[in-house]
Amino acid sequence: MASTSNTFPPSQSNSSNNLPTSRHASIVEMLSTPPLLPHVQVNDTDDKEQPEESTPPTATAAAPGPGCAATPAPLRDEKPQFKLSAVPMTQTPSQCLSCVHAQKWQHIPLSQLIEQNKLIFVPGSISVEEAFNTLIKYHLNSIPVESFPGDMNCFTFDYNDLNSYLLLVLNKITVSNKQLTADCQNGKPVPVGEMVKLTPKNPFYKLPENESLSTVMGILGSGVHRVAITNEEMTKVKGILSQRRLIKYLWDNARSFTSLEPLLNSSLQDLHIGVLNIQSKPTSRQSRVISIQGEEPLIMGLYKMHVERISSIAVIDKQGNLLGNISVTDVKHVTRTSQYPLLHKTCRHFISVILNSRGLETGKDSFPIFHVYPSSSLARTLAKLVATKSHRLWIVQPPESSTSASSTNLTAANTAANAVSATAQSSANGATPMSKSSSSTSLNSHSPLMTAMEDPPSPRSSAIAIPPPSPASSTNTPNLFEKEYRTGKLIGVVSLTDIINLLARKQTGNKEVDPQSARRQRGSIAM
């Protein structure tokens, strides 16, 4: 086992055109509104998606080009409301869209969204370790596995397969293929083509590049994670369109798609997406809220994701408050033998390891926010999904609503910035499990991700109320972690599938698409 595991590797400039505004954009504005569209021509810029591990671009000023956008109406999240045109944002790579497509996003051909230069296949004969190395090298989340060159019905290898492989190596799961099990546990190379057959998957959906977004919405809105885009003759795969790339494209170009505005202005509660009561049984169209206690070992979290066929899991405390998020892609942090002890430490501890790792990689503290509130607008939710590159966000009860019957409006820019700054300073003083990373890296308490992704906290929020800890109390890591990172009681979840399904039902002909059909096809395992 050791020999097999040791083969895994360790893991803009501002626009010169400034908007004529007399004030700085607030955090709420930046997060709740899509980027401005500069004057571009079709195929002016390469539509390249950022690598999976890269930091989202800094929000900088960029003036809209002539004729690209009429004066847009405001998008709503928290009060007060702001006009779209008030927010200076930078151009994003996906904005290669001509204004002729305004209000007609359903008719855009799929050829606009594919990345031909990023299409990579691997043969099924290579080992799981080599396939994993390819994911890391090219910053991918999945990769097609060919049985032969030009295979049009191939499987895909992703981090769910890697998680299954790790659990098989550790003898935590069993499969019918006894030879493959023996090879895994004896440290022999295992062909990736055999491994991908063990994890239930959806069919390899294919659509020609001349099909429209309206067509693909019906497939991705059913819970299928990715679709292959072929040439018009359907004889060659030209690209892969994932749920996440589709959402990023729609968000980056939302100013051109004015028909989306009423939905973007609406709250999750009003749109009836996401499970908003963890105690009640979800409907057939809703995702279940799947979580794990922070004190449970990491290996149980990985096992639970494998059994439930999910790509991330919420970590909660004993009172049901959200502590953090563990994604199946985080399995890359435990693929070497030297990292195996982490598997038997708590999920709470692993979250701190992930944060430390991000700090070392990016040179600054990183604390992505994976939660929204029932009152959060769809616009804010999309912005967070794009910025965190995640497939789902956890819906939490606002902190003050669980302790006081009198609700207070959430404060905006200056309060949020002060809260983030205070939290970052507390981290630098050794208040959180991130402190070791903080002391050895450059602290940037006003980094774009930290400030733009922070929901404005309430006056009762623990991020504001906690004073710097005394040296005597700084060793009490669990309590400090719970106070510093708790965001509210977990009451629901909203996923990319939920949002794409909503758009498909509301604005395309796919009125009856079921967001849970693909997951039911993949199935959960009863062990």
UniProtKB/Swiss-Prot annotation:
GO terms for biological process: cellular response to glucose starvation; endocytosis; regulation of mitotic metaphase/anaphase transition; septum digestion after cytokinesis. It comes from the Eukaryota. One of its GO terms (molecular function) is protein serine/threonine phosphatase inhibitor activity. The keyword Nucleotide-binding does not apply. GO terms for cellular component: cytoplasm; cytosol. SMART domains: CBS. Involved in DNA replication and cell separation during budding. This is Protein SDS24.
